[in-house]
Amino acid sequence: MKYLAAYALVGLSGGTPSKSAVEAVLKAAGVPVDPSRVDALFAEFAGKDFDTVCTEGKSKLVGGVTRPNAATASAPTAAAAASSGAAAPAAAAEEEEDDDMGFGLFD
């Protein structure tokens, strides 16, 4: 992901992404550069300009994963809370989950 982000930064800066430019961005960010990963990135994008890569990426993001809102999915209705009595304090005691969905973008 870091290599792709570096590629995007070079492309968005108005330049044509090159291996040396991507490596320079990675080094500036303190990321150890693996030349084989840079080569694999450019092999994947061979023959495509930056705009084409962005357009293809956006089309793949359209069908993203959705999940119900945790507050509406787990919150009991007023009638259910009144009838269950003891269940309401147990539900209130639950801890909230971290909503980062495990992406760890900058780990």
Curated annotation (Swiss-Prot):
Query: What's noted about post-translational modification?
Result: Phosphorylated.
- Which residue windows are coiled coil? none
- Which GO MF terms does the UniProt record name? structural constituent of ribosome
Q: Could you state one GO cellular component term attached to this entry? A: cytosolic large ribosomal subunit
**Keyword Hydrolase among UniProt keywords:** no
Q: What does this protein do?
A: Plays an important role in the elongation step of protein synthesis.
Q: How does it assemble?
A: P1 and P2 exist as dimers at the large ribosomal subunit.
This protein's name: Large ribosomal subunit protein P2-A
Query: What is the originating organism of this protein?
Result: Trypanosoma cruzi
Taxonomic lineage per UniProt?
Answer: Eukaryota, Discoba, Euglenozoa, Kinetoplastea, Metakinetoplastina
